[in-house]
């Protein structure tokens, strides 16, 4: 009996070690491509000489995978588009979380969002979804603007669309955007564990959100603006709309667990591993829901493990009962009030023709800072 117990213990340790290694592999690859936001520019793509053409050379500091490099070489202009999309995602993340304990801090280097990407919490889910959405949105827009040589407007919609309108114009190329988003972003995921499935799900949720937020725009034709006939096309939403939708899904994110129907094997085509809600009474998450598998840290104190700075020194709202209020944002530690001088433009006048002149007015305001 003791021998059996000992062997079972060894098996458990081996499984845990293998799982830990799998997680490490996934962590080492996840989000590496985000580093392009700090180094990507036109100078990172170097063409060969006219006398002896050679393949494009990418700056090694980008630390991209072979598939990602191939996509960049095959689609001139796409590196800049992906970089713009990542910048948009970072701005959107900081905007939506500006008043929360975790305010989407970013830094230099390859791990732009820090060690939070190694976790499996709600914040991690939002980061993966918004960055995937940013790439999809930016690439789709770049196609219709002619910034990427290998794609253009989406001309699949043609002909009559209804009794008084027809498809035409230049629809944003959402399908090419989703293709690049999937091939470029998802290729950085490695492993066969829960984190791998969760990251892929949230990447897909980000791309689908861009698709579902697209809207039809039309232009009227007819005598004296009668609008007897319209030409319509599909237009990408403002990226703020995408961020709003993903923030709503962050608030309603589903906690999930890994399921392979009790099998110890990775799975087969007929029975692949999948995500299930941790609470069996909850519905399965949809393809657009954000998912996570561990509770978020409280983000109150600096954490080397999570790479988060804590909330000391953050400006809070002393009259708010919400997340930006001093009681919640400062985690009960209290706050200090400081007088701060603010200089603003004032007493502006319009001068013919054509400029505006203003004075600089200085005032004092009280700000509250977490201890």
UniProtKB/Swiss-Prot annotation:
InterPro entries: Wnt, Wnt1, Wnt_C, Wnt_CS
Positions annotated as glycosylated: 28, 261, 317, 360
GO molecular function annotations of the record: cytokine activity; frizzled binding
Pfam family, one: wnt
Assigned GO CC terms: extracellular space
Signal peptide, first to last residue: 1-19
UniProt modification remark: Palmitoleoylation is required for efficient binding to frizzled receptors. Palmitoleoylation is necessary for proper trafficking to cell surface. Depalmitoleoylated by NOTUM, leading to inhibit Wnt signaling pathway.
Cysteines paired by S-S bonds: 93-104, 143-151, 153-170, 218-232, 220-227, 300-331, 316-326, 330-370, 346-361, 348-358, 353-354
Record GO biological process: canonical Wnt signaling pathway; cell fate commitment; forebrain anterior/posterior pattern specification; negative regulation of DNA-templated transcription; neural crest cell fate specification; neuron differentiation
Keyword terms, alphabetized: Developmental protein, Disulfide bond, Extracellular matrix, Glycoprotein, Lipoprotein, Secreted, Signal, Wnt signaling pathway
Biased composition (Low complexity): 261-270
Primary location group: secreted
CDD domains: Wnt_Wnt1 (cd19333)
Chain positions covered by the region annotation Disordered: 261-281
Annotated localization: Secreted, Extracellular space, Extracellular matrix; Secreted
Residues anchoring lipid (O-palmitoleoyl serine): 224
Family designation: Belongs to the Wnt family.
Protein purpose: Ligand for members of the frizzled family of seven transmembrane receptors. Acts in the canonical Wnt signaling pathway by promoting beta-catenin-dependent transcriptional activation. Plays an important role in patterning during embryonic development. Plays an essential role in the development of the embryonic brain and central nervous system (CNS). Has a role in osteoblast function, bone development and bone homeostasis.
Protein name (record): Protein Wnt-1
């Amino acid at each position: 009996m003791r021998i059996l117990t000992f062997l079972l213990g060894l098996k458990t340790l081996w499984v845990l070690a293998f799982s830990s290694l799998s997680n490490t592999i996934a962590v080492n690859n996840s989000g590496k491509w985000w580093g392009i936001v700090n180094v990507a520019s036109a100078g990172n793509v170097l063409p060969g000489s006219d006398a002896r053409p050679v393949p494009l050379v990418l700056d090694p500091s980008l630390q991209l995978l072979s598939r990602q490099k191939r996509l960049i070489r095959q689609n001139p202009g796409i590196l800049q588009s992906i970089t713009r999309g990542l910048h948009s995602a970072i701005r959107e993340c900081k905007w939506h979380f500006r008043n929360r304990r975790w305010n989407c801090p970013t830094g230099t280097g390859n791990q732009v969002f820090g060690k939070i990407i190694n976790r499996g919490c709600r914040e991690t889910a939002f980061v993966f979804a918004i960055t995937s959405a940013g790439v999809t949105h930016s690439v789709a827009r770049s196609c219709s603007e002619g910034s990427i040589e290998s794609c253009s407007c989406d001309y699949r919609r043609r002909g009559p669309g209804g009794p008084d309108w027809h498809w035409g114009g230049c629809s944003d190329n959402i399908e090419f955007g989703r293709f690049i988003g999937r091939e470029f972003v998802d290729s950085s995921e490695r492993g066969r564990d829960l984190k791998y499935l969760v990251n892929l799900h949230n990447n897909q949720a980000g791309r689908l959100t861009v698709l579902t937020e697209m809207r039809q725009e039309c232009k009227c034709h007819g005598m004296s603006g009668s609008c007897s006939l319209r030409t319509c096309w599909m237009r990408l939403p403002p990226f703020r709309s995408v961020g709003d939708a993903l923030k709503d899904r962050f608030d309603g994110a589903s906690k999930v667990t890994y399921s392979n129907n009790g099998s110890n094997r990775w799975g087969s085509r007929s029975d692949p591993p999948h995500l299930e809600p941790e609470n069996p009474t909850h519905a399965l998450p949809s393809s657009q829901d954000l998912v996570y598998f561990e509770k978020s840290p409280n983000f109150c104190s600096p954490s080397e493990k999570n790479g988060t700075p804590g909330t000391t020194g953050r400006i809070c709202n002393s009259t708010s009962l919400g997340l930006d209020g001093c009681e919640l944002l400062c985690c009960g530690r209290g706050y200090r009030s400081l007088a701060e001088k603010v200089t603003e433009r004032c007493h502006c006048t319009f001068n013919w023709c054509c400029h505006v002149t203003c004075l600089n007015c200085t005032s004092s305001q009280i700000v509250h800072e977490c201890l």
